C-alpha cells in the first residue's frame, strides 16, 4: 500500500508516533489510509453542510475496512466575489486547490482519496488533483440547492441579480428586492440552476469519476448522505481493484462529457474547466472539439438561466442517467467507458433502468430544444483563436446581429454605464483587459449581463469580452475572446462606434473594419498593463495561458 511509506518499517517509528498522536490505533494504521478532502466552510452556502457529507463518507470508508483521514481545501463563492476585486481570485483558486491537494496527498501518501467539492472552482480543481495524483479516488459533491421563491414563482440567485436592474428601471422597489433576496436562496447547496457548479457536478458523473446521482441529488436530502456513504465504501472497492482515475478518464470519457455538456446546456465555464481537467490525464480537448460535438449534439434541457426549470426538476425527470440514456438512443454515448462503479456507462444505465420521466424537462432526441448543443464556438476577425457563447440562452433576435461597439476597459466602467442607462438597443458592449493575463484573473461578468436583462435589453444588446461569464448569465454574452487584449488580440483594437457582426449559427464574430485601418491601429497599439499589487495575481498573470487553452498554467 502507498501509505506504507509513512507507516511501515523500523525507520518509520517516528512517523507512527505522530499518527498515534492523532488517536489512531495500531489496528487503524494496519488498514488502508483514505484521504478525505473536505472543502467545507462557513462562507459559501454550497459548502456550509459539507461536514455532514464528510462524516458520511468517513462512515462508508470505515464500514468497508479503511481508515479515513480528513483534510481541508479552500472554496470561493463566486456570487459573493462578484463585481469587485475578489473575482480576480476565483479562477486562480482552481489551480491553488489542485496544487494544495497535490501537496497534502504527496506529503502524506494516502492509499486512496475521496474529494468533497461543490461550488464553481472547487470541482474542477479537485478533478485536476485527482487525475494528477492518480490513486484510487472518487468525487462526491455537496449537491444542488433547491429553488427559492419570488412573487409566487420559482426563483434563484440570478433572479436577484436581475432584480438590481429592475429596481433601476422602476419595475421593482428596493424593499421588494430585499424580500426576494431573503427567499431566492432557501438553504444549503450549489445555486439551483445549471450554473457552473452544477454543470461541473453533473459532468463529473458523465466523466465517470462520481457515482450516478452526484449531479442532481438535492443537498438537503437524506439521499445525498446515503450517496456520500456509498462513495466512501466505493473508494475501498476501487482500491481493492486498483482502478485509478486515469483508467477511467480516456478519450471516450472526454467524448461523453462534451456530449452531455451540449445536451444539458451547461455553463460556458465548462469550456475552461474540462480542458484543464483532461490535460492532467494527458488528453487534449480543444475548442474545435467542443464545436464539432456541439454541431451534432442536440440541446435537450433548458434549465435556469436559459429556462424556468431547476436542477431539482432535472433530478425528478431522471437526472444525468436519463440524459445519457436519451443520448445513447442516437449513439452519442460511449457505453463501454469505465466508471467509478467498476462498471461501464452502459452497464450503469441498464442497472438503473435509466429513462426520462418528464419530457418537459428532458426533451426526446427527436424533439430537442435545438438540433445543436448549448454552447457554440465563434471565430472571426475579432476572435481569431475563438470565443464562447451559451447559444441556448441567447434570444432569437440576437443570434444574428450587426451591433455598434461601446468600448469599456473594465467591468466596473461597463456596469456603471448600464445602470446609468447610457446603453441603447443595438449596442455591443465591449469589456476588455479582463482576460486571464490582463485582468488578471478573468473575472465573471454576471453583474453587467444581469443588469442588461433586468433593464429589459436582453434581446437587444450584446456583451463581448475577453473575460468570462457566470453560469447564470443569459443573453448574447460572448466571452473568452482570444487572443485577449493584453496579448495583443484584436479586441484591444476595437474603437467606440465600430460595427461588429455576430452570426452564431455561422459561428462568426467579426470586427467590420478594413484591413488597412486595422494595420494602422496595430502599429499604434500598446496593450494596457494594469497595476497589480497582489503577489499571487502577479504570478498568475505570468504563468497563465490563453482561455482558448483552458487558462491553465504554462508547462
Curated annotation (Swiss-Prot):
Q: Where does Mg(2+) bind?
A: 78, 120-121, 444
Which residues bind [2Fe-2S] cluster per the record?
119, 191
N6-carboxylysine occurs at 121
Instruction: Report the active site residues.
Output: 470
Question: Which Gene Ontology terms of cellular component type are present?
Answer: cytosol
Please provide, alphabetically and separated by semicolons, the GO molecular function terms listed in this UniProt record. 2 iron, 2 sulfur cluster binding; dihydroxy-acid dehydratase activity; magnesium ion binding
- Please give the catalytic activity noted in the UniProt record: (2R)-2,3-dihydroxy-3-methylbutanoate = 3-methyl-2-oxobutanoate + H2O; (2R,3R)-2,3-dihydroxy-3-methylpentanoate = (S)-3-methyl-2-oxopentanoate + H2O
Instruction: Kindly indicate whether the keyword GTP-binding belongs to this entry.
Output: no
Pathway noted in the entry = Amino-acid biosynthesis; L-isoleucine biosynthesis; L-isoleucine from 2-oxobutanoate: step 3/4; Amino-acid biosynthesis; L-valine biosynthesis; L-valine from pyruvate: step 3/4
What is the role of this chain? Answer: Functions in the biosynthesis of branched-chain amino acids. Catalyzes the dehydration of (2R,3R)-2,3-dihydroxy-3-methylpentanoate (2,3-dihydroxy-3-methylvalerate) into 2-oxo-3-methylpentanoate (2-oxo-3-methylvalerate) and of (2R)-2,3-dihydroxy-3-methylbutanoate (2,3-dihydroxyisovalerate) into 2-oxo-3-methylbutanoate (2-oxoisovalerate), the penultimate precursor to L-isoleucine and L-valine, respectively.
Q: How does it assemble?
A: Homodimer.
Kindly provide the name given to this protein in its UniProt entry.
Dihydroxy-acid dehydratase
UniProt organism field: Oleidesulfovibrio alaskensis (strain ATCC BAA-1058 / DSM 17464 / G20) (Desulfovibrio alaskensis)
Amino acid at each position: 500500500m502507498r501509505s506504507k511509506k509513512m507507516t511501515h518499517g523500523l525507520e518509520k517509528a517516528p512517523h507512527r508516533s505522530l499518527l498515534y498522536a492523532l488517536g489512531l490505533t495500531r489496528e487503524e494504521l494496519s488498514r488502508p489510509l483514505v484521504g478525505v478532502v473536505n472543502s467545507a466552510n462557513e462562507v459559501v452556502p454550497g459548502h456550509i453542510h459539507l461536514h455532514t457529507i464528510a462524516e458520511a463518507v468517513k462512515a462508508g470508508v470505515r464500514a468497508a475496512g479503511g481508515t479515513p483521514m480528513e483534510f481541508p481545501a479552500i472554496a470561493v463563492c463566486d456570487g459573493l466575489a462578484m463585481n469587485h476585486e475578489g473575482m480576480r481570485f476565483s479562477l486562480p483558486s482552481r489551480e491553488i486547490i489542485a496544487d494544495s491537494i497535490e501537496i497534502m496527498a504527496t506529503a502524506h501518501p494516502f492509499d486512496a482519496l475521496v474529494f468533497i467539492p461543490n461550488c464553481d472552482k472547487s470541482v474542477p480543481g479537485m478533478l485536476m488533483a485527482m487525475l494528477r495524483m492518480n490513486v484510487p479516488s472518487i468525487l462526491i459533491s455537496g449537491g444542488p440547492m433547491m429553488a427559492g421563491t419570488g412573487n409566487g414563482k420559482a426563483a434563484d440567485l440570478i433572479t436577484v441579480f436581475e432584480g438590481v436592474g429592475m429596481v433601476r428601471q422602476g419595475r421593482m422597489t428596493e424593499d421588494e428586492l430585499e424580500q426576494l433576496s431573503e427567499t431566492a436562496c432557501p438553504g444549503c447547496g450549489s445555486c439551483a440552476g445549471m450554473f457552473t457548479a452544477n454543470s461541473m457536478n453533473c459532468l463529473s458523473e458523465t466523466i465517470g469519476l462520481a457515482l450516478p446521482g452526484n449531479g442532481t441529488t438535492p443537498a438537503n436530502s437524506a439521499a445525498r448522505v446515503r450517496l456520500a456513504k456509498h462513495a466512501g465504501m466505493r473508494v475501498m472497492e476501487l482500491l481493492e481493484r486498483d482502478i485509478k482515475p486515469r483508467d477511467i478518464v480516456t478519450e471516450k470519457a472526454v467524448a461523453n462529457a462534451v456530449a452531455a455538456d451540449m445536451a444539458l446546456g451547461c455553463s460556458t465555464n465548462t469550456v475552461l474547466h474540462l480542458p484543464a481537467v483532461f490535460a492532467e490525464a494527458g488528453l487534449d480537448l480543444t475548442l474545435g472539439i467542443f464545436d464539432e460535438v456541439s454541431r451534432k449534439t442536440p440541446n435537450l434541457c433548458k434549465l435556469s438561466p436559459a429556462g424556468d426549470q431547476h436542477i431539482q426538476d432535472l433530478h425528478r425527470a431522471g437526472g444525468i442517467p436519463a440524459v445519457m440514456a436519451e443520448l445513447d438512443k442516437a449513439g452519442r454515448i460511449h457505453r463501454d467507458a469505465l466508471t467509478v462503479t467498476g462498471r461501464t456507462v452502459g452497464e450503469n444505465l441498464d442497472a438503473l433502468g435509466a429513462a426520462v420521466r418528464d419530457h418537459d424537462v428532458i426533451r426526446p432526441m427527436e424533439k430537442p430544444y435545438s438540433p445543436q448543443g448549448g454552447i457554440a464556438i465563434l471565430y472571426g476577425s475579432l476572435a481569431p483563436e475563438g470565443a464562447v457563447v451559451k447559444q441556448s440562452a441567447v434570444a432569437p433576435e440576437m443570434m444574428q446581429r450587426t451591433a455598434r461597439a461601446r468600448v469599456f476597459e473594465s467591468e466596473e466602467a461597463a456596469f456603471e454605464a448600464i445602470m446609468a442607462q447610457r446603453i441603447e438597443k443595438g449596442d455591443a458592449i465591449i469589456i476588455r483587459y479582463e482576460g486571464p493575463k490582463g485582468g488578471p484573473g478573468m473575472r465573471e461578468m454576471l453583474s453587467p449581463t444581469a443588469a442588461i436583462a433586468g433593464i429589459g435589453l436582453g434581446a437587444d444588446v450584446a456583451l463581448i469580452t475577453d473575460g468570462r461569464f457566470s453560469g447564470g448569465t443569459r443573453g448574447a454574452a460572448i466571452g473568452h475572446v482570444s487572443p485577449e487584449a493584453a496579448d495583443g488580440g484584436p479586441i484591444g483594437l476595437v474603437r467606440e462606434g465600430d460595427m461588429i457582426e455576430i452570426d452564431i449559427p455561422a459561428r462568426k464574430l467579426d470586427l467590420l473594419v478594413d484591413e488597412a485601418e486595422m494595420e494602422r491601429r496595430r502599429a499604434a497599439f500598446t496593450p494596457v498593463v494594469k497595476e497589480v499589487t497582489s503577489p499571487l495575481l502577479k504570478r498568475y498573470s505570468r504563468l497563465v495561458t490563453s482561455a482558448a487553452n483552458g487558462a491553465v498554467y504554462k508547462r
